[in-house]
Amino acid sequence: MSSIVVVGTQWGDEGKGKITDFLAEQADVIARFSGGNNAGHTIQFGGETYKLHLVPSGIFYKDKLAVIGNGVVVDPVALLKELDGLNERGVSTSNLRISNRAQVILPYHLAQDEYEERRRGDNKIGTTKKGIGPAYVDKAQRIGIRMADLLEKETFERRLKENIEVKNAYFKGMFNETCPRFDEIFDEYYAAGQRLKEFVTDTSKILDDAFVAEEKVLFEGAQGVMLDIDHGTYPFVTSSNPVAGNVTVGTGVGPTFVSKVIGVCKAYTSRVGDGPFPTELFDENGHHIREVGREYGTTTGRPRRVGWFDSVVLRHSRRVSGITDLSINSIDVLTGLDTVKICTAYELDGEEITEYPANLDQLRRCKPIFEELPGWEEDITGCRTLEELPDNARKYLERISELCNVRISIFSVGPDRDQTNLLEQLW
């Protein structure tokens, strides 16, 4: 039995989808464990580019199961749109499995997301307005509707009517707005559930069977550790737990099933949305990184904020996610810069600190302490080993590994599959 968890170590958009797809070649089952269609990942497969939001990366392998675990919140209409898009391009989706315990996103969740952001004004979180947070709130309040409920007409009808009554009272009191009506939701979403019915099952049992059969299971994370609701830059975070530990809760397997945790990062840092970002760049270096790296959100299309690599962030992610191996992407984006910088610590009120603060006001006062290294001009997009990299590029990666106390097992020098290079055997 062997299993690998892939997590983002920064604020999402680190290239997890590409690394998951790369590792999926040798896996038997690929499972998502958190988030929803607020996540976006770009996959290169068969010479084509695909942008996925809910569907696991393993969907492209007909002989492997692609699992949406119970920790994922599912918008059935959005999921069907994604599946139909794949089918139209000749991709079979018959290998998809959806947990019957996954929570369902409904139109009132999207409306609530919009109203909440509007209410916050200048203090808005910067959500994708996909209804993710409100769906997780309903789950915690024990009024959420699960996939198993959606499939049963009478259950769905009863639960939906009850929830609309609750939402109407809340929307009127908080936002002076009304909830979407029952007749605007029921028929469309019940029909969507019936179309998805063939995929819905107890996915925990599927994963347990895979472990018993000593198959290889790959757990695909969404967002990044710094967006984790407990361990990220709270409150500028997502509403779930992208950390590796959530695999057990979000898929229904025990912690003893996890063998390795691959932390994915870029050779720099990027972020979509609001919140503190100590190493953020506003100069020509930032412009270079954003344009060369095509740093625009897969889901939102918004320009991402970019900055130098932050080892304080990565050490925090390594600790709270138990990262055993590092995958560094987009090293090629830094080519052409005279010098490159790594944040080694922060200065807070005149004192040097090496751990990530929990207090947001303290974090805003933090100033990055940088170590400056020489850049490189050589084209590295064809490099396949560390030895083939220019000395300065190799030393840059080695310094990251040293500062973060984790070995580099994968490095990537471009978007294509053959530009992703394995240094250590992971399966």
Swiss-Prot record:
Entry-linked SUPFAM superfamilies: P-loop containing nucleoside triphosphate hydrolases
Organism domain of life: Bacteria
Pathway membership, UniProt: Purine metabolism; AMP biosynthesis via de novo pathway; AMP from IMP: step 1/2
Keyword Hydrolase: no
InterPro entries with a match to the protein in the record: Adenylosuccin_syn_GTP-bd (IPR018220), Adenylosuccin_syn_Lys_AS (IPR033128), Adenylosuccinate_synth_dom1 (IPR042109), Adenylosuccinate_synth_dom2 (IPR042110), Adenylosuccinate_synth_dom3 (IPR042111), Adenylosuccinate_synthetase (IPR001114), P-loop_NTPase (IPR027417)
GO BP terms, alphabetized: 'de novo' AMP biosynthetic process; IMP metabolic process
Subcellular localization(s) per the UniProt record: Cytoplasm
Residues where substrate binds: 298-304
Residues engaged in binding IMP: 13-16, 38-41, 128, 142, 223, 238, 302
Main location: cytoplasm
Keyword annotations from UniProtKB, A to Z: Cytoplasm, GTP-binding, Ligase, Magnesium, Metal-binding, Nucleotide-binding, Purine biosynthesis
GO terms of molecular function: adenylosuccinate synthase activity; GTP binding; magnesium ion binding
Catalytic activity: IMP + L-aspartate + GTP = N(6)-(1,2-dicarboxyethyl)-AMP + GDP + phosphate + 2 H(+)
Catalytic residues (positions): 13, 41
Residues annotated for Mg(2+) binding in this entry: 13, 40
Summary of the function given for this chain in its UniProt record: Plays an important role in the de novo pathway of purine nucleotide biosynthesis. Catalyzes the first committed step in the biosynthesis of AMP from IMP.
Family: Belongs to the adenylosuccinate synthetase family.
Descriptive protein name: Adenylosuccinate synthetase
Lineage, uppermost ranks: Bacteria, Bacillati, Bacillota, Bacilli, Bacillales
